Design a protein with these regions (language model features):
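Core subunits and conserved enzymes of cellular information-processing
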Residues: 1-19
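Alpha-helix capping and helix-coil boundary motifs
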Residues: 4, 23-26, 37, 78, ...
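Export/targeting segments at the very N-terminus of extracytoplasmic proteins
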Residues: 13-54
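Catalytic and binding regions of secreted/periplasmic enzymes and modules that target cell-wall glycans
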Residues: 46, 60-110
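Extracytoplasmic/secreted cell-surface and envelope-processing proteins
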Residues: 56-58
Length: 110
């Protein structure tokens, strides 16, 4: 019986990691569908990997930036709404994800 309990607990972190990886893949797929352009998707994929590793709960310790896109004062908890808001922000401020990524490379933020 003890061996069975140890097996269950030893597998728990792997189950959590798999579901998190699946979630991240779903967030990326959703973003790709929103953008359609493969080059622009690749830029936002790199940008948000740098910013949050696609974690919808990511918090910036130096500012109020939060979520996948690391938007200042973001209150939205839903990852898909975070993505929508992040893409809207990029379009308003930088026009394209590739321009946002270039800005990030030069300044360390976008």
């Amino acid at each position: 019986v003890l061996l069975g309990v140890l097996c269950v607990f030893s597998n728990t972190p792997n189950a959590i990691a798999v579901s998190t990886a699946r979630d991240v893949n779903n967030y990326k797929l959703y973003t790709h569908i929103k953008l359609l352009d493969a080059k622009e998707y690749r830029c936002v994929e790199l940008l948000w990997t740098l910013e949050s590793r696609w974690d919808p709960r990511a918090k910036n310790p130096k500012s109020s930036a939060y979520g996948i896109p690391q938007i200042l004062k973001l209150k939205e908890l839903d990852p898909y709404k975070q993505i929508d808001l992040g893409l809207k922000y990029i379009k308003a401020r930088h026009l394209t994800p590739c321009k946002a990524l270039a800005f990030h490379k030069a300044k360390g933020h976008y």
